[in-house]
Amino acid sequence: VRELQGMPCIELDDAPGPKQQIACTRSFGKPMHELRPLIEAVTEFAGRAAEKLRKQHSLATELLVFMHTSPHRPEAQCSRSVVVPLRRPTDDTLALAQAAADGMRYMYVPGFRFIKAGVMLMDLQPAGILQRELDLEPVAREDKSTPRDRSRLMTAMDAINGRYGKG
């Protein structure tokens, strides 16, 4: 009855909550059939998605990579996707780009002309709430940096991209 009289009974949340998934997908200007340009595309998409992830102060625990051919062409069709679980929740561009490249290598099928690909970051959680794990695996000699070590680099990259644009 109060609502009919113009009195709000439920408060509206003006600011939307953080996204539960972040995606970056694109259709290509021309079909791609080789693995290397597909990897380049999804690693770029992962970087853009990582920037959005950091902007909302979240971490991803899974990354989905997909690609497909044109459903409007008479040739054979192919649509593939794979979910790559991340070892630790992260917003690190390098870790996400590597996961996207690994996913593309895993699902790539030669002989098809792909017109669209994309990356989706999933199972997002707030960056401030991170459950640590006991890490008993030795750090590889060539991989001494961790996502935590690169957080200042990611901040600098976001600032440069914001000032001068992406690309």
Predicted regions and their residues:
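Acidic, metal-coordinating catalytic segment for phosphate/diphosphate chemistry
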Residues: 80-81, 85-167
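DNA-contacting surface of Y-family translesion DNA polymerases
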Residues: 1-111
